[in-house]
Amino acid sequence: MAASLPGPGSRLFRTYGAADGRRQRRPGREAAQWFPPQDRRRFFNSSGSSDASIGDPSQSDDPDDPDDPDFPGSPVRRRRRRPGGRVPKDRPSLTVTPKRWKLRARPSLTVTPRRLGLRARPPQKCSTPCGPLRLPPFPSRDSGRLSPDLSVCGQPRDGDELGISASLFSSLASPCPGSPTPRDSVISIGTSACLVAASAVPSGLHLPEVSLDRASLPCSQEEATGGAKDTRMVHQTRASLRSVLFGLMNSGTPEDSEFRADGKNMRESCCKRKLVVGNGPEGPGLSSTGKRRATGQDSCQERGLQEAVRREHQEASVPKGRIVPRGIDRLERTRSSRKSKHQEATETSLLHSHRFKKGQKLGKDSFPTQDLTPLQNVCFWTKTRASFSFHKKKIVTDVSEVCSIYTTATSLSGSLLSECSNRPVMNRTSGAPSSWHSSSMYLLSPLNTLSISNKKASDAEKVYGECSQKGPVPFSHCLPTEKLQRCEKIGEGVFGEVFQTIADHTPVAIKIIAIEGPDLVNGSHQKTFEEILPEIIISKELSLLSGEVCNRTEGFIGLNSVHCVQGSYPPLLLKAWDHYNSTKGSANDRPDFFKDDQLFIVLEFEFGGIDLEQMRTKLSSLATAKSILHQLTASLAVAEASLRFEHRDLHWGNVLLKKTSLKKLHYTLNGKSSTIPSCGLQVSIIDYTLSRLERDGIVVFCDVSMDEDLFTGDGDYQFDIYRLMKKENNNRWGEYHPYSNVLWLHYLTDKMLKQMTFKTKCNTPAMKQIKRKIQEFHRTMLNFSSATDLLCQHSLFK
């Protein structure tokens, strides 16, 4: 072994044989066990080691790490001679100061103890979070709390490719003694994620109480969105309340948290706790958003995004006496670098080419396991996003349980709901009266007196009721042979498959979701009746807006029917699945493994057309883009007024376009009807996985407060929007913040101006004027508080 002194930035690695392989280890000799020094702390500065551990818990560079034999935590001295071993006399001793051990945080090999053998670690699966581990968003002093970090999860036990999605978002702790009883008015649906329970105020802690002046709170939705002054006042008050609440959560003990051992239910009740205004820390989840996975690309753009996120954290911790102007704060956002079209196409092809299918054997042409790491950097976000987005738990709660000033303020939508909710609506496809005549949100109200077994039966009955059935029916009941013969697969997701067919001479989309079965579907557990019920009702509520009077729009995809069927997958659908797989490539498992008793939910939607992303080069002109923005803004504004709705995931894959012969499209907002030039296209909004809505005192939302992977994406403005939403609502996703709709409209406008090309160039004065208006819309829209505010006040829609 060479005896030269290491350079200042070099790292000492232990070698397990002589250089050039001239001398090999004796096969029968065991290595002596390594003993750590008794007192390591006296040799080092405690701040250096703590900083290293905070920077990356997964690294072995910490000199105080007892598990790293290369850095024993004390100055290097002469090695202890092993029994029977030889040490060359001419080998000089090395003296290495602790300063040389301050290495840059980066992924490194973890050396296992020699007595355990030197077998190579198995490669990570594509769905395994890659990159350095992150600290939990809660302060580390509460050792009894679970770490919400998704990357600490190990490999899935089931062995499926996406099987990790079930373990990524489940809590494994059991309730501690003395835990408060969960509130029955909150239903936590699913096993995918967890809702952090607020900690109670310690008995010995006394904080000064400050009363809030009711005059400073908005009295209606109009006042909440009418001007910048009221908006700033609302946000400052909400920020004060939330900082106190997060301070109370941090001050609790491990016994204050509510967890269930099965990971299915974790609930909180925050409104019954006494709110006191104090200097609370940052909200949960805010401390770790600045940590981003190492992608292997050290570029100025990445450093710029890190700096932008760091500035957001500094802004979030501004003292309460300092007022940050709302408009200036939003206009100074930093946009991450976007991928080129070539990069996006390459990533998509890699994703489709190298996905391991369930039950397939690896042949000589299969993707080699040792090359998984570069692929993980390419498709990590795509697969992780898919693995949890369709299996998010929906939180169903009462309005009083959501501590939001927006919620407690008098809402115009409350009176409108009572006026417009009890009328029969027309089926968009057939024109006949629909089987469901009014809202079904009341079905989500918790039944406090039911036991677990009765609750499960009740959920099944509710689903059957929405399907107008008494029990499951065969596939042939809703998909007769002539309908199946015309089926063509058009999409897929972790939830299942989407097919297109013809019903009554009209194209429709069929979405098939497996439920209540023991088999993993595409690596994830199947949904239950309890989990699928909110999905059905949300789709129905937004579809019903097409038949309302006071607030009406056809901008959300129409839901024609829902059925619960039982049986194995029909052969004609398998044939359509095979054709899609051979032409486009499928990332899903072939659905041929279901038994005869398998249950499915079959949702029939109107056919919405092609998504905006695929139409990026096919639109005629910027006038069409203006019509699309107008339709989207109007649809979101109507949903805000009627359902206090936030979409929260309106990327350009969730905007569908189809041709229409109508010259103008009609909508009604707060009783006032208006029209929009269609330019030959009708827009439909889809995918309500992350959405939030409220009706009849019931709030349904998706809690993503602990899902750090949602906020660490990179390479597109879309991922900045998730972080901006989190900053806007202080990571409290049950509250109503219509500004999130403005953020997504800004994202779509950005796409149209920078990543879409049009057949007709801006050569005429009229086209140039439209382009200037859209550019002005892009520059100024972040100063508006909601889609309703944009629609009514911005000059683009005048």
Curated annotation (Swiss-Prot):
Q: What is the effect of changing K511A?
A: Strongly reduced enzyme activity
| Effect of substituting H651A | Strongly reduced enzyme activity, markedly reduced affinity for histone H3
Per the record, which residues fall in region Disordered? 1-110, 275-350
Instruction: Name its co-factor(s).
Output: Mg(2+)
Where is there biased composition of kind Acidic residues? 59-70
Record EC number = 2.7.11.1
- In the UniProt record, does the keyword ATP-binding occur? yes
Description of how activity is regulated: Constitutive activity that does not require phosphorylation. Specifically inhibited by 3-(1H-indazol-5-yl)-N-propylimidazo[1,2-b]pyridazin-6-amine (CHR-6494).
Entry-annotated residues carrying Phosphothreonine: T97
Binding of ATP, residues? 490-498, 511, 606-611, 649-654, 687-689
Reactions listed under catalytic activity: L-seryl-[protein] + ATP = O-phospho-L-seryl-[protein] + ADP + H(+); L-threonyl-[protein] + ATP = O-phospho-L-threonyl-[protein] + ADP + H(+)
Query: PANTHER family, per this entry?
Result: INTERLEUKIN-1 RECEPTOR-ASSOCIATED KINASE (PTHR24419), SERINE_THREONINE-PROTEIN KINASE HASPIN (PTHR24419:SF18)
Q: What is this protein called?
A: Serine/threonine-protein kinase haspin
Per the UniProt entry, what species is this protein from, by scientific name?
Answer: Homo sapiens
Show the taxonomic lineage.
Answer: Eukaryota, Metazoa, Chordata, Craniata, Vertebrata
